[in-house]
Amino acid sequence: MRSIEIPAGIVEYDETGSGPPVVLLHGLLMDHTVWDRVLPLLPSGLRIVRPVLPLGAHRRPMNPGADLTLAGQVSVVADFLEALDLDDVTLVHSDWGGALLLTARGLDRRVARQVFLPCEAFDNFPPGLPGTMVKLASRVPGGLRFAARQLRVGWLRGLPPLFGQMARRPVPDDLVRRWTDPLLGDPGVLRDLLAYCRGPFDGPSLIRDTEALSRFRGEALVLWSPDNRVMPAEHGHRLAALMPRARYAEVPGAYVLSMLDEPEAVARELGEFLT
């Protein structure tokens, strides 16, 4: 893993290939490995960058006092692109929708194209039943670590409040252990995740900030999974309608984590969009 320092702390990332930059984002309690099944299926001639955002599965805690609320996490993404001096970026969103707000904050100047897999949008922060579970767990002492331990038990992991509505296919044990080890082992990682989960999520403001994507003039692909129950199908269509140069497509048979459920379909759509 490589690493780079930004104002909030040190961000680790994986990078492969050379060419136009493509930045693959991930969701809460996950890291870059959520993309492992898609990565070898993508076209050559691309610089694929996969940051590990401070969303609970990161191995290096951020600086004490860093702003890791939703607003702060948006800045983390912008600062990461800045630190690597990435221009004409294709930014790929999945699950976590914070980076959708770059345009609203005037921080999207390095982003030329965007791809939206099922992700938080409008007032769906935190999203659905899994999001409600995380929010409640963050309010209870020891709650997030208890939830992480539940994720490590296969039959519990498949229940709707955990990963049952996130992935249609079982999420492998090795991935879940990797994602939960930092939270269970490092108080700094727990501190960072609590800072995010306990931060403000104002519905009307989030709707306005999502709708600011109407100002985004680059190409966009909304690659939604209509079978998922966490990110409403309506939101995918609304996102596509917002952006002047957006195209809508679907990945049938997948839930939120379509890159795990249907990696070939996701890679095919991404490849067509990127080349």
Task: Place the predicted regions along the sequence by residue.
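Alpha/beta-hydrolase fold catalytic core
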Residues: 1-22, 43-46, 82, 86-87, ...
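Active-site loop/oxyanion-hole signature of alpha/beta-hydrolase fold enzymes
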Residues: 49-96, 268
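Conserved hydrolase catalytic core segment
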Residues: 87-128
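Helix-rich cap/lid subdomain of alpha/beta-hydrolase
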Residues: 126-181
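Conserved serine/cysteine hydrolase catalytic core
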Residues: 187-238, 250
